[in-house]
């Protein structure tokens, strides 16, 4: 009987220790930490090219690269010269609201407007005719996840497997200057 | 020769006066951006009338409420005054809070409106931060203890303690809801740990924000003018009697005030019925937000543990958007395969379209995930987003537009 009681006591102490340890490990702060970047590259950029591009920047920590279309959102876009944009719009580019998504607005890159378009648009005869008249091709975004994560159970350790917002802002600004990089999105760890 | 000397003399004098004036002008400009407590009270009162009149969700019982004219001053972690937080009472019960920006560079004057405020423990948090400071630095000199927004929208106490020997300053943060210590690195402006709201405002945003403040001031003044015409002093708390005076009839108060003063030329509002859930652990904001959205889109409520696992969460780590999307997209999760993350600069029209055409979405600050389920647009004068926040307990509030940094849009 006393043996069983002893076992229960040991088990209870163990359980309490586990709970206390878990509680101590739980993050109670709200530090801004970024563990990766989701980067949108120009059509046709290959993973080795991505690697070569990133090597020119101080990324602060070691990272891994995963270029996979499932990482990102919109697949397709068109690239229109800023000066030609009014003509293309006049010709009906914004005629059908299903051709674009307000959640992914167009943006400028150098002398061009990058105009994300839906899957529906690229199968729409009218839409394709507009592109044809203006000699515009449908392009595909290349999405890459550049991650600082390692095999640690804690992946939110600053200076080890995630970086500060200040570094993330610097990297974002620097990378977005590169002609092959369209958008850089820091991955904030949310609590 | 004499003429040349006089010319040179005048030039030197002009330069001298110029040199003397430039810092004075700059200082004047800096000073001009601050908002006094009296100005803030005017804005709080005027906007309360506006909310009572427009009657969005959560304000149904606000008629007859009054604002405590003595605000709690909330500071930024950089030491600058950030918000005046006014408490709203009805029959001595706390029914709301209105945060007014203490500086015009923050933008629109009303920063946050809580309609189901969670009581927080200002005195206890301050005492605890002092206590920790004394324990950790027995030889230190406590320089100040203030209530701060340490990582928007989280509020806590900050005690600054200076080591008498080394002269190094430390900041001790204690959360005002949980009374838990919030870690910080030694007090340098660039060290991470907590988030300054002032530091995130870029120079190019300042001009735009000043315009937004002017717009909200215009709305306040138009309400103030109408109140004055009715013999009501807007500097005094807004009572039921005042609302009656403005309407002449309590039963039609809302409509009359609405027509008379509170509705600008353009007004639009939509709130979607999204439940508000509490996050089950300190690091479950993404699962809790996804849980709210799943209930809205699919009318089911999976557990936050299941969602966390599908987001590849490993306790006790937080979750990024890309990992959260694993759950959003999965057929065994939210089953919204075309959901997307975005950090592109958000435009007001984008939010309106998103809510109207698609539905609620995850709205993230740099450290936290919440759900945006509505908006209120007062014709470029003021604009708010309706936020369901899972931390520290699920609650909803109106937030000045422009506070979020990243979003997940839900797409089938």
UniProtKB/Swiss-Prot annotation, chain A:
Source organism, top-level taxon: Archaea
Pfam family, one: UPF0228
InterPro entries: UPF0228
The species this protein was found in: Methanosarcina mazei (strain ATCC BAA-159 / DSM 3647 / Goe1 / Go1 / JCM 11833 / OCM 88)
Protein name as catalogued: UPF0228 protein MM_1428
UniProt similarity note: Belongs to the UPF0228 family.
């Amino acid at each position: 009987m006393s043996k069983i009681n002893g076992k229960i006591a040991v088990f209870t102490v163990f359980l309490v220790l586990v709970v206390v340890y878990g509680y101590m490990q739980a993050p109670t702060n709200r530090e801004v930490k970024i563990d990766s970047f989701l980067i949108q590259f120009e059509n046709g950029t290959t993973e080795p090219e991505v690697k070569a591009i990133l090597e020119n920047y101080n990324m602060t920590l070691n990272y891994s690269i995963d270029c996979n279309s499932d990482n990102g959102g919109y697949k397709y876009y068109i690239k229109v010269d800023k000066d030609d944009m009014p003509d293309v719009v006049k010709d009906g580019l914004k005629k059908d609201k299903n051709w674009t998504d307000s959640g992914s607005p167009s943006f400028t890159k150098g002398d061009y407007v990058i105009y994300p378009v839906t899957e529906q648009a690229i199968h729409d005869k009218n839409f394709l005719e507009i592109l044809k008249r203006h000699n515009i091709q449908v392009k595909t975004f290349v999405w890459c996840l550049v991650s600082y994560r390692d095999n640690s159970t804690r992946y939110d350790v600053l200076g080890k497997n995630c970086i500060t917002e200040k570094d993330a802002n610097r990297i974002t600004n620097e990378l977005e200057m590169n002609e092959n990089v369209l958008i850089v999105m820091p991955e904030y760890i949310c609590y | 020769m004499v003429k040349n000397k006089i010319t040179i003399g005048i030039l030197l004098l002009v330069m001298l006066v110029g040199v003397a004036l430039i810092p004075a002008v700059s200082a004047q400009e800096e000073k001009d951006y601050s908002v006094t407590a009296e100005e803030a009270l005017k804005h709080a009162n005027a906007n309360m009338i506006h909310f009572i009149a427009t009657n969005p969700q959560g304000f149904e019982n606000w008629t007859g409420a009054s604002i405590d004219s003595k605000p709690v001053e909330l500071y930024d972690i950089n030491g600058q005054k950030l918000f005046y937080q006014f408490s709203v009472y009805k029959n001595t019960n706390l029914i709301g809070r209105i945060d007014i920006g203490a500086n015009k560079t923050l933008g629109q004057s009303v920063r946050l409106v809580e309609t189901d405020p969670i009581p927080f423990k200002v005195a206890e948090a301050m005492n605890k931060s002092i206590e920790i400071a004394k324990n950790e630095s027995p030889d230190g000199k406590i320089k100040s203890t203030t209530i701060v927004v340490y990582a928007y929208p989280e509020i806590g106490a900050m005690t600054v303690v200076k080591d008498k020997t080394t002269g190094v300053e430390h900041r001790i943060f204690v959360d005002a809801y949980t009374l838990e210590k919030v870690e910080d690195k030694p007090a340098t402006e660039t060290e991470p740990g907590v988030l300054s709201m002032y530091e995130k405002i870029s120079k190019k945003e300042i001009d735009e924000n000043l315009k937004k403040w002017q717009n909200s001031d215009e709305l306040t003044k138009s309400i103030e003018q109408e109140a004055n015409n009715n013999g009501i002093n807007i500097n005094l708390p807004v009572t039921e009697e005042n609302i009656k005076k403005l309407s002449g009839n309590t039963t039609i108060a809302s409509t009359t005030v609405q027509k008379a003063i509170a509705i600008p030329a353009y007004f639009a509002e939509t709130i979607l019925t999204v439940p508000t859930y509490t996050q089950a652990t300190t690091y479950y904001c993404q699962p809790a937000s996804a849980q709210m959205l799943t209930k809205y889109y699919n009318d089911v409520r999976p557990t936050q543990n299941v969602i966390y696992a599908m987001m590849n969460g490993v306790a006790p780590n937080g979750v990024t958007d890309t990992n959260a999307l694993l759950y959003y997209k999965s057929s065994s999760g939210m089953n919204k395969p075309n959901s997307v993350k975005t950090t592109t600069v958000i435009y007001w029209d984008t939010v309106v379209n998103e809510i109207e055409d698609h539905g609620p979405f995850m709205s993230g600050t740099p450290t936290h995930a919440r759900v945006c389920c509505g908006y209120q647009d007062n014709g470029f004068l003021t604009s708010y987003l309706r936020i369901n926040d899972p931390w520290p307990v699920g609650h909803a509030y109106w937030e000045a537009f422009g506070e979020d940094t990243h979003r997940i849009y839900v797409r089938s």
